[in-house]
Curated annotation (Swiss-Prot):
<dbReference type="InterPro" id="IPR036900">
    <property type="entry name" value="A-D-PHexomutase_C_sf"/>
</dbReference>
<dbReference type="InterPro" id="IPR005844">
    <property type="entry name" value="A-D-PHexomutase_a/b/a-I"/>
</dbReference>
<feature type="binding site" description="via phosphate group">
    <location>
        <position position="101"/>
    </location>
    <ligand>
        <name>Mg(2+)</name>
    </ligand>
</feature>
<protein>
    <recommendedName>
        <fullName>Phosphoglucosamine mutase</fullName>
        <ecNumber>5.4.2.10</ecNumber>
    </recommendedName>
</protein>
<dbReference type="Pfam" id="PF02880">
    <property type="entry name" value="PGM_PMM_III"/>
</dbReference>
<dbReference type="InterPro" id="IPR005846">
    <property type="entry name" value="A-D-PHexomutase_a/b/a-III"/>
</dbReference>
<dbReference type="GO" id="GO:0008966">
    <property type="term" value="F:phosphoglucosamine mutase activity"/>
</dbReference>
<dbReference type="InterPro" id="IPR005845">
    <property type="entry name" value="A-D-PHexomutase_a/b/a-II"/>
</dbReference>
<feature type="binding site">
    <location>
        <position position="245"/>
    </location>
    <ligand>
        <name>Mg(2+)</name>
    </ligand>
</feature>
<dbReference type="InterPro" id="IPR005841">
    <property type="entry name" value="Alpha-D-phosphohexomutase_SF"/>
</dbReference>
<dbReference type="Pfam" id="PF02879">
    <property type="entry name" value="PGM_PMM_II"/>
</dbReference>
<dbReference type="InterPro" id="IPR016055">
    <property type="entry name" value="A-D-PHexomutase_a/b/a-I/II/III"/>
</dbReference>
<feature type="binding site">
    <location>
        <position position="243"/>
    </location>
    <ligand>
        <name>Mg(2+)</name>
    </ligand>
</feature>
<feature type="modified residue" description="Phosphoserine">
    <location>
        <position position="101"/>
    </location>
</feature>
<dbReference type="InterPro" id="IPR006352">
    <property type="entry name" value="GlmM_bact"/>
</dbReference>
<feature type="active site" description="Phosphoserine intermediate">
    <location>
        <position position="101"/>
    </location>
</feature>
<dbReference type="GO" id="GO:0005829">
    <property type="term" value="C:cytosol"/>
</dbReference>
Length: 448
């Protein structure tokens, strides 16, 4: 990570940290680095989520892009994977998404995609950061007819949905599915997609007002969706996050089905159909021990990366694997898209439920989860946790007590000023006790 770029683009409190001035510079410098590779009039597609700050930042970003001579196509409210897909499909030189994903409404972010639909490399981010920190802006300033134009392509969302439909066999007729759009990017796309596939749908989180994105709804708050599933006797529920790149499900009993379980279900189905490349799934170090044991029972291999879907994607690209993801619900199906895609994952999961004739609880129950506890602690310097001797000592103490029957992971968040403490153990009681023991030490020596 650099000075400006975190694990998922540039993020901050909108109009305070992520200002219109910075958005203009990101448009100008980012657009130049990505789009002006011998292309006289490069095309850049731009999408956003439903945050109140989105239009402000979009306007500034687009102005920066236009100042370099780029042609800009505004997609309006759309998902992050929708931007990635349309960047490739429309032969654009770059794509930009304005969103802070699952973060609260006051935050926003800007993430770039190259012409191939993949997020930026470290080298590209470093090049943009060097331009941001330069004493003088020496990039070309076209005038007159050489300036860029802007146009609206709000139909792009439905072009993306048409593609998603083509990735599954048949329809979803006979299923009743509860959908939670997080008052975000999927608020209209999800009901349209699943309805078009003949599913019976009920919804929450599909009435954005600019300020309610992720507010008690979506993939980080699936409790209301669980209630909706039970109240409406739905077959299962699907919860998306603010920008639609992750998915958490709820089974017919109201139990949460997380990214590990979804990956397990997809891997089992893909492997049985001969579609899982090298019988391999890529996950992060946060995936549950039960996930790995479940894959082993199916003779499916696994590979671990650092936390962050960008690292999952990097490993998948490096080794040509086609399924990977995170416990948080970022699931990457590389045969179909270049980034985590909640809608894509959702229709494939629904298709498996229909084809198998099993309930989602039966499918998810084939993987036994180890009790896991995760605590997020606000700190002034999140990276200092890696060198803190008090934290290191308590981790060793807990690991010695576990004696191999569990694991501990303490790490800085990639996007927020937090230290994340994760513990897995044989019992709920042990997991709770161990995570509290470590968290108390982190708070005492590092907390605000």
């Amino acid at each position: 990570m650099g000075k400006y770029f975190g694990t998922d683009g540039v993020r901050g409190v909108a109009n305070s940290e992520l200002t219109p001035e910075l958005a203009f510079k990101l448009g100008r410098f980012g657009g130049y680095v990505l789009a002006h590779n011998g292309t006289e009039k490069p095309t850049v597609v731009v999408g956003r989520d439903t945050r109140i700050s989105g239009v402000m930042l979009e306007s500034a970003l687009v102005a920066g892009l236009l100042s370099t001579g780029a042609e800009v196509m505004r997609l309006g409210v759309i998902t992050t994977p929708g931007v990635a897909y349309l960047t490739r499909e429309m032969n654009a030189q770059a794509g930009v998404m304005i969103s802070a994903s699952h973060n609260p409404v006051q935050d926003n972010g800007i993430k770039f995609f190259g012409a191939d639909g993949f997020k930026l490399s470290d080298a590209q981010e470093a090049e943009i950061e060097a331009l941001l920190d330069a004493e003088e802006d020496t990039l070309p300033r076209p005038v007159g007819v050489e300036l860029g134009h802007t146009s609206d392509y709000f139909e792009g969302g439905h072009r993306y949905l048409s593609y998603l439909k083509s990735t599954i066999e048949g329809d979803l007729e006979g299923l009743k599915i509860a959908l939670d759009g997080a008052h975000g990017s999927t608020y209209s796309l999800a009901p349209y997609l699943f309805g078009d596939l003949e599913a019976d749908t009920v919804t929450i989180g599909c009435n954005p007002d600019g300020n309610n994105i992720n507010d008690g709804v979506g993939s980080t708050h699936p409790e209301k969706l669980a209630e909706l599933v039970l109240d409406t006797d739905s077959d299962f529920g699907l919860a998306f996050d603010g920008d639609g790149d992750r998915l958490i499900a709820v089974d017919e009993q109201g139990q949460i089905v997380d990214g590990d379980q979804i990956m397990f279900i997809l891997a089992q189905d893909m492997d049985a159909r001969g579609e899982l490349k090298d019988h391999m799934v890529v996950s992060t170090v946060m995936s549950n021990l039960g996930f790995y044991k479940g894959l082993e029972s199916l003779n499916i291999k696994s590979d671990k990366t650092k936390v962050g879907d960008r690292y999952v994607v990097e490993e998948m690209r490096r080794s040509s694997y086609n399924l990977g993801g995170e416990q948080s619900g970022h699931i990457v199906m590389m045969d179909h898209n270049t980034t985590g895609d909640g809608l894509l994952t959702g229709i494939h999961l629904a298709s498996i439920v229909k084809r198998s004739g099993k309930t989602l609880s039966e499918l998810a129950g084939q993987m036994t989860k180890y009790p896991q506890r995760l605590v997020n602690i606000k700190v002034s310097d999140k990276h200092a946790v890696e060198q803190n001797e008090h934290v290191a000592a308590v981790i060793k103490e807990v690991e010695d007590e576990m004696n191999g029957e569990g694991r501990v992971l303490v790490r800085p968040s990639g996007t927020e000023p937090l230290v994340r403490v994760m513990v897995e153990a044989k019992t709920d009681e042990d997991a709770e006790r161990f995570v509290n023991k470590i968290s108390d030490v982190v708070r005492a020596h590092m907390g605000l």
